[in-house]
Amino acid sequence: MPKQVIIPPGTTAPIAPFVPGTLADGVVYVSGTLPFDKQNNVVHIGDPKAQTRHVLETIRSVIETAGGSMADVTFNSIFITDWTNYAAINEVYAEFFPGDKPARFCIQCGLVKPDALVEIASVAHIGTPT
């Protein structure tokens, strides 16, 4: 099955040469997602919970556009700028994954926009369409 580009309705062009997600062989690959508004500005500056919620809602929209749900997520790559935000980010993260949790890693690093506190990339196995 060829790769399919996934762009949720109302999504604006990314600030770099990539797409929000791709679907191949029943697997959705969601690009690293930052807390951006439709003009690619960072939202909820200084609020790690609100930024995490915004990021995960954006990821959910990509996965749902591909035909899946957050329950299909099998792996997350999480990048944070400050370990002091780790508990707040995990609190919101747990709301989006209430049952069996996906595998993940979390590292502290700099992000492409100074006001962004969190970035998440996801992989979801949604199966093949029938």
UniProtKB/Swiss-Prot annotation:
Keywords: Hydrolase. InterPro entries: RidA_CS (IPR019897), RutC (IPR019898), RutC-like_sf (IPR035959), YjgF/YER057c/UK114 (IPR006175). It is an enzyme of class 3 (hydrolase). Its EC number is 3.5.-.-. PROSITE patterns: UPF0076. GO terms for biological process: nitrogen utilization; uracil catabolic process. It catalyses: (Z)-3-aminoacrylate + H2O + H(+) = 3-oxopropanoate + NH4(+). The keyword Hydrolase applies. GO terms for cellular component: cytosol. The keyword Nucleotide-binding does not apply. One of its GO terms (molecular function) is deaminase activity. Involved in pyrimidine catabolism. Catalyzes the deamination of 3-aminoacrylate to malonic semialdehyde, a reaction that can also occur spontaneously. RutC may facilitate the reaction and modulate the metabolic fitness, rather than catalyzing essential functions. Belongs to the RutC family. This is 3-aminoacrylate deaminase RutC. It comes from Klebsiella pneumoniae subsp. pneumoniae (strain ATCC 700721 / MGH 78578). The gene is rutC.
